[in-house]
Regions:
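Short helix-capping segments at alpha-helix termini
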Residues: 30-33, 59-63, 102, 125-129, ...
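Active-site neighborhood of HAD-like aspartate-dependent phosphohydrolases
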Residues: 1-42
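Asp-based, Mg2+/Mn2+-dependent phosphohydrolase catalytic module
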Residues: 1-3, 97-100, 113-219
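Conserved SAM-binding loop
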Residues: 13, 88, 106-109, 141, ...
Length: 219
């Protein structure tokens, strides 16, 4: 029986991916480069180190990826400081509140950093529901490695078989599946690959669509 629900953050709870993409495009343009949607899709859900490898392969070995990341984060900071909004994905806040009312433990397993994770959850008014928050600051091996989910289960005192995962990215879903958890996928930018399609428990268009399956999800 499921006792804990673990959510990804970017692209699953919050509609941050489109903002990150705009910030990457601005940062790349400053360097005379074009950051394509295809390249961004390849970087979604993976670690900064792995993303840097892809970016360097795309632009060439001399491309200053560290500066690109620094400028991207600077643009993101500016967006927030100027009052830019971080919107929930459809049904996300309601899903967190629903599972909390059902008496389940709620946790976050994100590839983002702790500072941003706590900021978004706080601003969104849902941090109070979370019993555990695990980010890239807490693990050595990023998604698609299952470490972030295994660490989260340990924090919750739950067996992996008792955990229900919601993810949007291929890397994140692969991590949840590889951890041995019941993993549901709600794609935003990139559709699931064959591994995720074959091993995901459910695939939804939106978190608004999960309720008819609730008995099956929590069994």
């Amino acid at each position: 029986m499921i006792t804990s629900v673990i959510f990804d953050m970017d692209g699953l709870l919050f509609n941050t991916e489109v903002i990150y993409f705009e910030c990457y495009k601005k940062a790349a343009k400053e360097k005379g480069a074009e950051f394509s949607e295809e390249l961004f899709e390849s970087c979604v859900g993976i670690s900064q180190t792995d993303a840097a490898r892809l970016i360097r392969h795309h632009f060439g070995p001399q491309f200053d990826v560290s500066n690109l990341h620094a400028r991207t984060y600077a643009h993101f900071e500016t967006y927030l400081s100027e009052g830019g909004k971080i919107e929930f994905r459809p049904g996300a806040k309601e899903a967190v509140e629903f599972f909390h009312r059902r008496g389940l433990k709620i946790a976050l397993a994100s590839s983002n950093i702790t500072r941003w994770a706590e900021h978004f959850l706080t601003v969104g008014g849902i941090k109070k529901y979370f019993s555990a928050i695990t980010t890239s600051n807490d693990v050595s091996n990023p998604k698609p490695d299952p470490e972030v989910y295994l660490v989260t289960a340990q924090k919750l005192g739950a067996d992996v078989s008792q955990c229900l995962v919601f993810e949007d990215s291929v890397a994140g879903a692969t991590a949840g599946i590889s951890a041995g958890m019941r993993t549901c996928v709600v794609p935003q930018i990139k559709q699931p690959d064959s591994f995720v399609r074959n091993h995901a428990f459910k695939i939804y268009k939106s978190l608004q669509d999960i309720y008819p399956d609730m008995d099956e999800l929590l069994a």
